[in-house]
Amino acid sequence: MKLLFDFFPIVLFFIVYKFFGIYTATAVAMVASLTQVAFYRLKFQHYEKMHLFSLAIIMVLGGATLFFQNPWFIKWKPTGIYWLSALVFYGSSYIGSKPLIQKMMEANINLTTKIWYRLNLAWTLFFIVMGALNLYVAYHYDTDVWVNFKLFGGVGFTLLFVLIQAFYLTKHTDEKSFEKQ
């Protein structure tokens, strides 16, 4: 259910774009992101950092898209999120006691420090590649293709990456890791 909630703004953007175009879809995504953050706050009594991060980017780039009537600003949004995520993941390898991926997953899986750092680097590289891929599609194809890529390509590549990561992790975990759950 949380995954669906997390994808709520992008799914709404996709549907509205198909019927009303990029500017209406951008406005709806901005409102959906704001609603998502408010609802999460009311329900759980705190904010989720990723929702706030995404909200800030969509308000700035979505606002610029609407103000200047230029879709290129919103097309940069996924790249901004991917590349800032890459920076945060990479930085966490040098700032703090543990890489970010370890902080996120260590309650569910037991890995060596070396593997946590490799996994963190893999996510960093994944985010860099996805940001570059978004720009490639945005600049080499029309907006219809970019919108489809944004939803289906972004989600598809992420799921594929997680699946590959799961296979990699099975070689580096022991049975006790899975007994925790």
Swiss-Prot record:
Compartments, record wording: Cell inner membrane
Main location group: membrane
List the record's Gene Ontology CC terms alphabetically: plasma membrane
Q: Which InterPro entries match?
A: YciB
Whether Cell inner membrane counts among this entry's keywords is: yes
Which topology term describes how it sits in the membrane?
Multi-pass membrane protein
Q: What Pfam families does the record tag this protein with?
A: IspA (PF04279)
Question: What UniProt keywords are attached to this protein's entry?
Answer: Cell inner membrane, Cell membrane, Membrane, Transmembrane, Transmembrane helix
Q: Which domain of life is it from?
A: Bacteria
- List residues traversing the bilayer: 3-23, 54-74, 81-101, 119-139, 149-169
Write out the similarity annotation.
Belongs to the YciB family.
Function (record text) = Plays a role in cell envelope biogenesis, maintenance of cell envelope integrity and membrane homeostasis.
Q: Which NCBIfam families match?
A: ispZ, PRK00259.1-3
Q: What is this protein called?
A: Inner membrane-spanning protein YciB
